[in-house]
């Protein structure tokens, strides 16, 4: 069974800020990841119903549906989905709520791409372990 490597990891980036989506998309593709983007939670859920992703990176503070609500809906669809949350309004209650809700990791904006890459490496190893269990 072929293991998931970092470069094979598929990632969905969800943020209502086009600049954040663009920077993450370009930075992660440059590292060899397969990256798609969504501008809001509804678009993300539609994309997740059509395509498989190993990881979702989502903003917490978005318009019609928060990243916390998106996190909950994704976990209902796929409890093993690795979800990273990011926000410029990080408060302890936000962090606790997301981590208790099943977030894999939490990032503060402005993002440090190095931190994201380290966490994605860990997520890739975790995805590889899960794939061996289900092969």
Regions found by a protein language model. Give the residues of each.
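Short amphipathic alpha-helix used as the core "switch/output" element in two-component signaling
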Residues: 46, 68-80, 97-100
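C-terminal output helix
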Residues: 91-93, 111-121
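The feature encodes the CheY-like receiver
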Residues: 21, 63-64, 87, 91
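Acidic catalytic/metal-coordinating carboxylates
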Residues: 39-43, 65-69
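Active-site beta3 strand of CheY-like receiver
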Residues: 51-57
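Two-component/phosphorelay signaling modules centered on CheY-like receiver
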Residues: 18-36
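Non-catalytic signal-transmission and effector/linker regions of two-component phosphorelay proteins
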Residues: 1-10, 131
């Amino acid at each position: 069974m072929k293991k998931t490597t970092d470069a094979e990891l598929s990632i969905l980036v969800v943020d209502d800020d086009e600049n954040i989506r663009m920077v993450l998309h370009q930075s992660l593709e440059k590292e060899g990841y397969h990256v798609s983007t969504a501008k809001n939670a509804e678009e993300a859920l539609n994309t997740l119903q059509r395509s498989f992703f190993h990881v979702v990176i989502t903003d917490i503070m978005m318009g019609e549906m928060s990243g916390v609500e998106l996190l909950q809906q994704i976990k209902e669809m796929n409890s093993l989905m690795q979800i990273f949350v990011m926000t410029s309004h990080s408060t302890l209650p936000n962090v606790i709520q997301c981590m208790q809700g099943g977030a894999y990791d939490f990032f503060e904006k402005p993002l440090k791409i190095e931190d994201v890459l380290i966490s994605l490496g860990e997520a890739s190893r975790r995805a590889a372990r899960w794939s061996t269990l289900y092969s």
